């Protein structure tokens, strides 16, 4: 059991010590957010509709109320994660997240679920303002000033 989880993925480098015990996390905190410039409305709506929740669908459709969570990378309290899962059963999305396109939609859907139930908080701001987009691994030395580095690989 854990009180707080830090969810990151494999193309992330924690470049400086981060004392998470000093980061105030009421319910959750995204590592990075992003705007709605690249929404995939049809795919996202298909996922949102799985929950059969009109209030959630209305919230999702009002793009002024929420932003995406880059890579779904989040600091989240265990009790809040349990609350979200009990309310929405996020495992319903397993059948819908099958490829990169769906994973990008999931970044918006999980962000929507978290923000509908709790005020949005972000640790590092907007990913598109935080660092240069598309930093390859062999250039991460140019980002030593950043506490967390996101790099891109060609898979």
Q: Can you describe what each PLM-predicted range is?
A:
Residues 1-155:
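ER/Golgi luminal nucleotide-sugar-dependent glycosyltransferases, focusing on the catalytic module
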